[in-house]
From Swiss-Prot:
Organism name: Streptococcus thermophilus (strain ATCC BAA-491 / LMD-9)
Enzyme Commission code: 2.1.1.182
Alphabetized UniProt keyword annotations: Cytoplasm, Methyltransferase, RNA-binding, rRNA processing, S-adenosyl-L-methionine, Transferase
Cellular compartment(s): Cytoplasm
Protein name in UniProt: Ribosomal RNA small subunit methyltransferase A
Amino acid sequence: MRIADYSVTKAVLERHGFTFKKSFGQNFLTDTNILQKIVNTAEINKNVNVIEIGPGIGALTEFLAENASEVMAFEIDERLVPILEDTLRDHDNVKVINEDVLKADLQTRVKEFENPDLPIKVVANLPYYITTPILMHLIESKIPFSEFVVMMQKEVADRISAEPNTKAYGSLSIAVQYYMTTKVAFAVPRTVFVPAPNVDSAILKMTRRKQPLVEVKDEDFFFRVSKASFLHRRKTLWNNLTSHFGKSEEVKNKLDQALENAAIKPSIRGEALSISDFARLSDALREAGL
């Protein structure tokens, strides 16, 4: 019997008198086939360390522990710590940390692995309400995570992996794809969770690039420009950029010059620009003194 078997999950929750907290976005997976698929997608083996976020009662953790060298699981809900100690008592390669991963000192934590030189993969069933902040926090951290295999709301997975000229493409697609290659591995129906969420989920696989997808002179400015370009999706690039940088004649002249230098039409919409277009645009805007 597995922790993720519905009857086991139910028994564990009842034994510990656990009640779900909406504020933590808790939905526990009760499908062993999907858990095995997650481990297969992440290609977990004994030469890999894993960081898991939001282990819940340990359904995914159990599969990870059987396959990985070590698992470090961050759980924000202190009520789940004794439950995890119970459900994972047979696995001595799991360390449960009762901490908000957004506040954790990950640089120090990863040194606590017994073999800290092994590649680190992030495998997680992320709370939907905080998926993007956690993801960006991990991607932008200096920890050399080689890969992320993450369960998230399907709509967010589609946005992250979207291509230009699609409805889902936006600043989030650019922010993640700048650092990572992305692929939606498979969809997960809402019916396999307790309690069932209001949305369908997907597993997104992200692999860190050896270097960012494009070269830019100022990363922060590049992300600022891409965000500004999607401020109002139906508006032109020109309208969004003037909303962001200002509408004075001086600013308009600089914008004109920058767009011309970047060979980008002001009448285009942000969603039509590729990531390399945004790199060219942000460098040109920076050179123009904006």
